[in-house]
Amino acid sequence: MQIALLLLIAYLLGAIPTGLIVGKLFFNKDIRKFGSGNLGATNTFRVLGKKAGIFVTIFDVAKGVLPAIFPIIYDLDIHGIWFGLAAIIGHVYPIYLNFKGGKAVATSAGVILGVNPVVFLIIAVIFFTLLFTTRMVSLTSILTSIGNFITTLFFDDIILQIISFLIMLLIIIRHSSNIKRIISGTEPKIQFKK
């Protein structure tokens, strides 16, 4: 019963639309109507600016970290990745918004941080290296999700490997429109200020 309740809490936590809330509360903007229309951190950066983007990124990562460490908090004999997966599903399919959510990149990163900080550090290096190289958040996110799965293969954790594979597939599917733009050469690139 406790595990079922915590899975539900993890889902509801993951479903909190951080970007939408920040946009409406502080900027009187529905970010779904601007930029890419996505609820995630990348579109928040584009539409609402750096400070809002950083806040949303941190909060979305936290939405993954907290459920992932539920087994530590509540002394449960279950892998934290299951609660993390519930949070990811909540972020992608939020009940509060008719199940139309974000792409789960930041929340997935938070889940990995919660269950295996070493893997997180490795994929963080991969992410920022690719970001500065390609300047495309979408391509970076896709390749990092693949890198995350490959990285988990070097750890003795079959559950983490399986869920990381599913997360990779989910992130690729959620970026299908981005993939089309990458192929056509029309995907936006971010500009780094000197």
UniProtKB/Swiss-Prot annotation:
Reactions listed under catalytic activity: an acyl phosphate + sn-glycerol 3-phosphate = a 1-acyl-sn-glycero-3-phosphate + phosphate
Name of one Pfam family that matches: G3P_acyltransf
Keyword flag rRNA-binding: no
Cellular compartments per GO CC: plasma membrane
Pathway: Lipid metabolism; phospholipid metabolism
Recorded topology in the membrane: Multi-pass membrane protein
Superkingdom of source: Bacteria
Subunit structure and binding partners: Probably interacts with PlsX.
GO BP: phospholipid biosynthetic process
Top-tier EC class: transferase
Family under the similarity heading: Belongs to the PlsY family.
Subcellular location(s) of the protein: Cell membrane
Keyword tags: Cell membrane, Lipid biosynthesis, Lipid metabolism, Membrane, Phospholipid biosynthesis, Phospholipid metabolism, Transferase, Transmembrane, Transmembrane helix
Function summary: Catalyzes the transfer of an acyl group from acyl-phosphate (acyl-PO(4)) to glycerol-3-phosphate (G3P) to form lysophosphatidic acid (LPA). This enzyme utilizes acyl-phosphate as fatty acyl donor, but not acyl-CoA or acyl-ACP.
InterPro entries: G3P_acylTferase_PlsY (IPR003811)
Molecular-function GO terms, alphabetical: acyl-phosphate glycerol-3-phosphate acyltransferase activity
Transmembrane segments: 3-23, 47-67, 78-97, 112-132, 153-173
Organism listed in the record: Macrococcus caseolyticus (strain JCSC5402)
UniProt name for this protein: Glycerol-3-phosphate acyltransferase
Listed EC numbers: 2.3.1.275
